[in-house]
């Protein structure tokens, strides 16, 4: 292969592997179940409700991460906004004081994911959108109302069908190695108004085994 051909191949691969700024095709709201998370990592606090891990713009062909590293994260200073975020999007590994003081978790999520939709949502809008979507379903109460309660094991199919009945789309489920429910991803179309089935879900494989909701 000639030098010019190698250069062309390299350029094509670079384009294929590089994220496309602002070209997301769907959005995934990832909610963490703190009880399972805190059995894996040391936590300073363990809420008994689903908390936000992140709001991730993505597309079907290329994983979107760090779309604009030059875009700064400006720390939140409004006390009410910080408390609202900490209630819904806490850094479980940090105390509330450290979390609000340094905002490291929010910064990491914004730089990695929020910059991939900043052509549509600025920093304030991005975090407000995540909180709005999280509050929309009140997932813990909705699961309980649909017969999914803590302390019991359920099939993946049961969980998928129940969450679809609540949200309107099949989720992306993540489990721990002990097959405890760790995260639920809810996917939205590019308008972030309509729930869709999550593309290529992990689904806590193998799907023929039960999943504990601790």
UniProtKB/Swiss-Prot annotation:
Glycan-bearing residues: 49, 59, 160
Protein name: Ribonuclease S-2
Subcellular location: Secreted, Extracellular space
Keywords associated with the record: Disulfide bond, Endonuclease, Glycoprotein, Hydrolase, Lyase, Nuclease, Secreted, Signal
GO biological process: RNA catabolic process
Species, as recorded: Nicotiana alata (Winged tobacco)
Pfam families: Ribonuclease_T2
Underlying gene: S-2
Gene3D superfamilies: Ribonuclease T2-like
Signal peptide range: 1-22
């Amino acid at each position: 292969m000639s030098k010019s051909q190698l250069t062309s191949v390299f350029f094509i691969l670079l384009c294929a592997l590089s994220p496309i700024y602002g070209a997301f095709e769907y959005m995934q709201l990832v909610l963490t179940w703190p009880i399972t998370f805190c059995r894996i990592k040391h936590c300073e606090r363990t809420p008994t409700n689903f908390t936000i891990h992140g709001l991730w713009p993505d597309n079907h062909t290329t994983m979107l991460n760090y779309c604009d590293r030059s875009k700064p994260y400006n720390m939140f200073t409004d006390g009410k906004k910080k408390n609202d975020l900490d209630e819904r999007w806490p850094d479980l590994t940090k105390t509330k004081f450290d979390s609000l003081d340094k905002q490291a978790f929010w910064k990491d999520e914004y730089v990695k994911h929020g910059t991939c939709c900043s052509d549509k949502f600025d920093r304030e809008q991005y975090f407000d959108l995540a909180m709005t979507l999280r509050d929309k379903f009140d997932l813990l109460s909705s699961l309980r109302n649909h017969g999914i309660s803590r302390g019991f094991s359920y099939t993946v199919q049961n969980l998928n069908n129940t969450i679809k009945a609540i949200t309107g789309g099949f989720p992306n489920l993540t489990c721990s190695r002990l097959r405890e429910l760790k995260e639920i991803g809810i996917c939205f179309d590019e308008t972030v108004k309509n729930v869709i089935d999550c593309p290529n879900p992990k689904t806590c494989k193998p799907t023929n085994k039960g999943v504990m909701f601790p």
